[in-house]
């Protein structure tokens, strides 16, 4: 009788251990994807430009923030959402429908890339590479390029101010 009880207990322990191993090796995570190929995303706003929204009483283009249009995009969840949003903006990807509605961008600019970013007490400093001086030009153009990046960055509540380096960027 004792041998039968011992064997029964041994079977129960082995079964419980097997079940525990399955649970431990495949935990249910409420914060991550359930399947390995599933990606967690977040929605960000990229700011593009529509000159029809940026005209004064005389129908002149004002070259102001009034022409900025936020478009929602999905990006992969990461520890660097600000940089990810700026990098996506720099790609300048608009759909045909967005272009048909009057939304434009001069991005991508050949050679322009985000080199780094730092956030200190609400001031976001963005460092760019611009080996071909593509961020220069007329005051209207460079203002809109600046506004697009600034508005895209300021959607994040921790960003209160945006600075660009080198300082030669976005100069008329």
Pin down the residues of each PLM region.
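Bimodal "functional hotspot" detector
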Residues: 1-172
């Amino acid at each position: 009788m004792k041998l039968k009880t011992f064997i029964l207990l041994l079977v129960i322990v082995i079964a419980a251990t097997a079940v525990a191993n399955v649970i431990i090796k495949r935990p249910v995570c409420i914060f991550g994807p359930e399947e390995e190929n599933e990606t967690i995303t977040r929605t960000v706003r990229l700011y593009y430009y529509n000159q029809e929204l940026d005209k004064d009483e005389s129908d002149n283009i004002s070259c102001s923030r009034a022409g900025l249009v936020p478009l929602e995009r999905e990006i992969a969840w990461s520890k660097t959402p600000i940089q990810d949003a700026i990098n996506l903006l720099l790609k300048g990807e608009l759909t045909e429908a967005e272009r048909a509605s009057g939304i434009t961008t001069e991005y991508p600019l050949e050679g322009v890339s985000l080199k780094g970013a730092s956030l200190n007490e609400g001031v976001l400093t963005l460092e760019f590479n611009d080996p071909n001086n593509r961020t220069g030009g007329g005051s209207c153009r460079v203002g809109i390029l600046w506004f697009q990046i600034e508005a895209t960055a300021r959607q994040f509540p921790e960003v209160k101010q945006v600075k660009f380096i080198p300082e030669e960027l976005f100069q008329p």
